[in-house]
Amino acid sequence: MHSYAKIEIMKLENYHLESHNSDLAAAHQRKLDFISSEIPGSSAIIDKLVDFQIAIPSWALGTGGTRFGRFSSGGEPRNIEEKIEDIGLLHKLNGASGAISLHIPWDTADNPSAIKVLAAQHGLRFDAMNSNTFQDQADQELSYKFGSLQHVDKAVRKQAIEHNIEVIRQGIEIGSKSLTVWLSDGSCFPGQLNFRKAFQNTLESLREVYAALPADWKVFVEYKAFEPNFYSTTVGDWGQSLLYTSKLGPQAYTLVDLGHHLPNANIEQIVSLLLMEEKLGGFHFNDSKYGDDDLTAGSMKPYQLFLIFNELVEGMDARGMSHKDDLGWMIDASHNVKDPLEDLLQSVEAIMIAYAQALSVDREALVAAQSISDVVRCQEILQQAFRTDVRPLVAEARLRAGAALDPLAVYRQYKVREELIKNRGAKTVATGL
């Protein structure tokens, strides 16, 4: 492991949180008592919130940026060990960030056993592994400029296949159970490629990756409408992803990134149908105004986030699925003007709020209203849940998990970013950015 100095402030002690929670206890209890009297089954909702965990991607811990520039916040994690420590801090604060998702080759560990131990010390598990064939690496023999798994050159496809299999191997070493494949493969101009052959090449390549999966693993095929290719993307929408996963087999699932749709797509309907087909694998949560903006979850379209969770809760309950374990939950955001850790705390909070609101929907009343096509009543039932302030339930879940009633306030009170800059430097850049 690297010899970078430890930052004690990152390892907030229980007494720090206890002092903070004590100061807020009376006000919190008043709010909790009120909302508990308003929402039937609030105790069961809190129990589900305590169990719910959202993975943090390693690449979200540093400042993101755009093609026009990047403005570092300083103190960014310089290696996988520091990334684990940062996510451990988030989990200590909110009790709901108990998993880390690695991106290879950025996060290749020199000592996988030591990494597993470090993660366990912070109460973290390893979520999906992410491969990278959308950019060329320094030691790479062949280029992905014109695609990877779709490439017209079989040698390039073979290189990309071998990379994905290597990512699986690394994941096995640290205890991950899934692989996410996002491809930038596509074209920028009409006539650049044959759509059918590109699909067939990609499917053939994915089949070789699929064959390397351990029996208890899943592969998630992530789709995106456009960018970096702007005329066509070879896994461009949920229908194409569903085609791939259906042809691959029962261990293959579609992954939904909220920002990977065309504007105003009905994501909640997509979610419902993928659940119906037993092909929904997981989520990358973020928010957007125009494209794949990767903004803080719930910052632009909180009602849409609630509607998505409404379909998730209904669909998962209809199939007897575990909310905690049967889908992959992850944030995928880029932070250009915010402190990345503060942004992640906000995103987790927004996701938990939307989940709690969906759990509070009067399902029996909604089904009854739907059965007689009472459109007004259906809308009222959903908006009653959405407009109810469930933040005391989310805060109580944190309290029961041993975390902070107000994570962001604790983060700022102990000046965590200032301490990170002091120990890591003002000009550090997180790997992968």
Which sequence ranges carry the predicted segments?
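Glycine-rich anion/phosphate-binding loops
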Residues: 106-115, 149-166
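Surface-exposed, active-site-proximal loop segments in enzymatic domains
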Residues: 68-69, 137-158, 183-196
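Basic, amphipathic N-terminal segments that precede the first structured/catalytic domain
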Residues: 11, 65, 70-71, 77-120
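Glycine-rich, aromatic-flanked loop segments that form ligand/cofactor-binding clefts
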Residues: 49-61, 104-139
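Acidic, His- and aromatic-enriched active-site or binding-groove loops in soluble protein domains
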Residues: 122-131, 150-158, 198-212, 238-247
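Aromatic-lined carbohydrate-recognition surfaces of secreted/lumenal glycan-active proteins
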Residues: 217-228
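Histidine-acidic metal/acid-base catalytic patches
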Residues: 4-65, 69-71, 78, 88, ...
